[in-house]
């Protein structure tokens, strides 16, 4: 995924974050302040904001770009933000007895945007045993790759893992410096085009594993249930709008998200690697605490990040998900 090295790599809360937010145009409207990195999957929130889908439900939403997970999580902990958008495995690492927040809706999943680059002679992960693999440790890349290894009966101990950003890993692979890399677009397409190796596996083969969610503090959810419902309604309307007005939607989202995605053509290309979640997909994904994709994913997150001592507490479905708003009234 483009630029996730700043999007999903950091871990640990940082103190003393100072953020400024514009005043709301409507004084009596509900308020919600969210932090996130620059990412195509967050486009529907900007679309809902700029098309007025949040406002028509009585909600003003501030979307603040902060290119570091630790910084926006620190801002949430300090009360400067009400929540954030991130992968569900990422936010699990910050959940503690003293820092309560829960996912209220899912935004998207990686659907081909992440992958493993290898040389042409490699046909399985087992062929990489003992070899060097470039990967961003502590990021969603490590989480996803460990799921792949688990399916093959392998662990990182079977490989020689080198910690580097996803962009650096791709560059090192293309330069012939390492035999394998865990990275994302546009590097996957570049390797396919130049035929400098191949993509052994990408996230289109593992749907529902790299999932972005919006999480809000437990206090915000408790004190502002109507605003949370308004947010989810506006988000769903934006996702439905994309289905029928793609060109207009991509132009609005590109401008809103900005950064490396400010060109609508670049945004459209990046969007090929994600799947936006509408209401039906949210209901399917979250399932229940007893059964469903989210429950399984959270168990994997607790297991994998726990094995690397990244967790502050044992996290289960009920401690990280609030299902109350997935089907708004």
Which residues are covered by each model-predicted region?
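Short, glycine-/small- and polar/acidic-enriched structural segments
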Residues: 26-163, 179-186, 201, 208
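Pocket-lining segment of extracytoplasmic ligand-binding domains
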Residues: 89-90, 161-162, 168-262
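Soluble non-cytosolic domains of exported or imported proteins
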Residues: 39, 66-70, 85, 135, ...
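Buried hydrophobic packing residues in well-ordered domains
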Residues: 76, 128, 145, 173, ...
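Secondary-structure end/capping motifs
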Residues: 222-310
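C-terminal segment of classical bacterial N-terminal signal peptides
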Residues: 17-25
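Bacterial N-terminal signal peptides that target proteins for export
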Residues: 1-13
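Hinge/cleft segment of the Venus flytrap/periplasmic-binding protein
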Residues: 301-329
């Amino acid at each position: 995924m483009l630029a996730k090295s700043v999007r999903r790599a950091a871990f640990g809360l940082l103190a003393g974050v100072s953020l400024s937010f514009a005043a709301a145009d409507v004084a009596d409207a509900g308020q919600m302040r969210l932090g996130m990195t620059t990412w195509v999957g967050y486009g529907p929130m900007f679309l809902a904001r700029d098309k007025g889908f949040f406002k028509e439900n009585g909600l003003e939403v501030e979307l603040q770009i902060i290119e570091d997970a630790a910084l926006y999580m620190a801002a949430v902990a300090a009360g400067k933000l009400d929540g954030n958008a991130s992968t569900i495995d990422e936010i699990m690492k910050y959940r503690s007895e003293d820092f309560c927040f829960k996912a209220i809706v899912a935004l998207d999943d990686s659907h081909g945007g992440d992958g493993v680059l290898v040389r042409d002679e490699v046909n399985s992960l087992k062929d990489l045993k003992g070899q060097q693999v470039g990967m961003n440790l502590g990021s969603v890349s490590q989480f996803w790759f460990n799921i792949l290894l688990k399916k093959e009966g392998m662990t990182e101990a079977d490989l020689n893992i080198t910690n580097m950003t996803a962009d650096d890993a791709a560059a090192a692979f293309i330069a012939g410096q390492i035999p394998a890399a865990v990275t994302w677009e546009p590097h996957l397409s570049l390797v396919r085009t130049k035929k400098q190796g191949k993509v052994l596996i990408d996230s289109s083969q593992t749907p529902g594993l790299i999932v972005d969610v919006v999480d809000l503090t437990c206090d915000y959810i408790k004190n502002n249930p109507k605003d949370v419902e308004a947010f989810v309604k506006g988000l769903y309307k934006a996702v439905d709008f994309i289905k029928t007005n793609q060109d207009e939607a991509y132009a609005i989202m590109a401008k809103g998200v900005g950064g490396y995605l400010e060109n609508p053509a670049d945004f459209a290309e990046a969007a090929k690697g994600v799947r936006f979640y509408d209401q039906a997909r949210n209901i399917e994904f979250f399932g229940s605490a007893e059964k469903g994709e989210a429950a399984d994913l959270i168990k994997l997150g607790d297991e994998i990040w726990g094995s690397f001592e990244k967790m502050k507490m044992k996290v289960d479905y009920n401690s990280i998900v609030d299902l109350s708003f997935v089907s708004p009234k």
